[in-house]
Amino acid sequence: MSLLEINDVNMNYHTKNGATEAIKHLSFNIEEGEFLSIIGPSGCGKSTLLNIISGLLEPSSGKVIYNDPEVKNNLDKMGYMFQKDYLFPWLTVRENVLLGLKIKNILTEENIKNADKLLKSYDLEKFKDHKPTQLSGGMRQRVALIRTLALNPRILLLDEPFSALDYQTRQKVTDDVYEIIKREGKTAIMVTHDLGEAIIMSKRVIVLTKRPATIKDDVEIVFANKDATPFKKRQEPEFNKYFGELWKEIDGVNG
């Protein structure tokens, strides 16, 4: 059974000028432990879809079915990672990581120990008393991810998480984030405009059409070298094959 089912979801916005269809008859499943990327033209409704999955938006019709009771009964089991890290500059790294636990009133001894363990596991312990302004952009994104993981989500929603980083930093951070999500055994859904990023991070890539968004293609991503990091996947022969395939799909959508 799939962890999550998107079942014939439609989203309409109503303004004084009339109704606008944002999403139309969207259906797909997400398996436990899967990393799924969603790509498509700007403004096609990718972020809207993430907000529907997270429960922040109610679809006009259709259903999001959470087959895990832990998620169904507690949508806090979904964690968000945004384009910006949203770290508070006056708090230390550790205080930023613990902030979500504090806000949700679950700052227990066990959860604090888990947060400290995450900081240590991902080489941030020695920076725990630093302020965010003392860190590189890549390290700040790692802190933002650890802050999300400290809440122990079952599903991670990533909305253009690397777009604010320069190219070189981006390559390093994609490796870091991929490894962390893999080691923690999380299910992840990422929205991105970067085809290469989608290929190297994902097991599947869904291509959306222009608004109203429907599914144009659902591509399984398989690399022969299963141990390749995202950075190394760019050098594998399958990368160019998938890039060409997805480029044609996107080019067809934009054409």
Give each language-model segment a name.
Residues 54:
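Helix-to-loop junction immediately C-terminal to a conserved catalytic motif
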Residues 156-159:
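Catalytic Walker B motif of ABC-type/P-loop ATPase nucleotide-binding domains
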Residues 130-133, 151:
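Conserved signature/switch motifs of ABC ATPase nucleotide-binding domains
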Residues 39-41:
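The feature captures the beta-strand-to-loop junction immediately N-terminal to the Walker
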Residues 91-98:
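Short coil-to-helix segment of the ABC ATPase nucleotide-binding domain corresponding to the Q-loop/switch region
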Residues 62-74:
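Conserved ABC transporter NBD signature motif
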